């Protein structure tokens, strides 16, 4: 997003706040979808709500034809509130809530993570013999990182889960799911796709209705960030690696193939605007304190240096190395290590690429959470999340009655 956009917003609100780039999100989403569908026409996006469940963003995905991928009753209820049909909601996760049964009775997509969950599905089937319950299985695989989720091919747990489901004629295993976020490289994507094709032949009768490959793709990103990852695959390269096994196996009747992107589609298109409060040197370390926190940026700021836009600058000193620290009383509240350049109190900075696991992970620690605005394709600015208040934070607590204080 251009510096001028951030500057124009400063006249309307105080820092800190988030800025969502609607047009950038749409273009990136469509680029991912087009690359995949060029190779495999029946590809679909199921957007990961846990990554960023801002209703405006989730509804934007809905308007673009995407499915909702949820992992809790809270997220499921959000998708329903936004008007999703159950057939376009994918309910995953290892600890599904009580809405799972309602979702399955209503024709929704859900994937069994463990035998205990399979037993729940079996109980539902017994209690509702007139219902046809379609279910998927979550497959675990070793791609250089062994996830804790799902059940391994050939394992006793997977066999137990399948046996529980097969006891009921009204339960149909129609799909498979996997999710491995720790290996984003092309060989791993080709391998996971082939494993899923082979598992479908083994565990699904006939052509599956769907196979989900989960998430774990690099996104389109700023060059500052790209350089820290090395050779980042393009969407076209991912499409060739991940979709070709399905074209080979299903040349005619094609199941839906999902990926479940979160950071891939949203990370780059949210920025966090914050102000420098103070600069001081403690022993040999120069520290700038900002009115935001590393919690506002998501876990990526603990692993990589985020792209940074110096929105407004005063006549400050030029520093060789300044650690940009947050407002909290935590020693580890480091937003960016080793900033070099001019800086002075009052300067406004925009941290970019903060759309993933930021607002959904930010606690109400010391301060209420800040607002978010969206810049729409025509330039309109819309507030899509207001700043929290004292009442928002404390309304759920029980206070002592007057006279008991």
Please provide the spans of the model-predicted regions.
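Short acidic, glycine/serine/threonine-rich loops at helix termini
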Residues: 58, 81, 101-105, 122-124, ...
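Structured core elements
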Residues: 90, 111, 136-138, 177, ...
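Active-site-proximal loop/turn and secondary-structure-junction residues that shape catalytic pockets
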Residues: 51-53, 74-75, 95-97, 114-116, ...
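Charged (often Lys/Glu-rich) extended helix/loop segments that serve as interaction or gating elements
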Residues: 9-10, 247, 252-405
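Conserved, mostly hydrophobic/aromatic
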Residues: 25, 50, 72, 137, ...
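Active-site loop/helix belt of alpha/beta enzymes
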Residues: 141-275
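A charged N-terminal "starter" segment
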Residues: 1-133, 163-172, 377-405
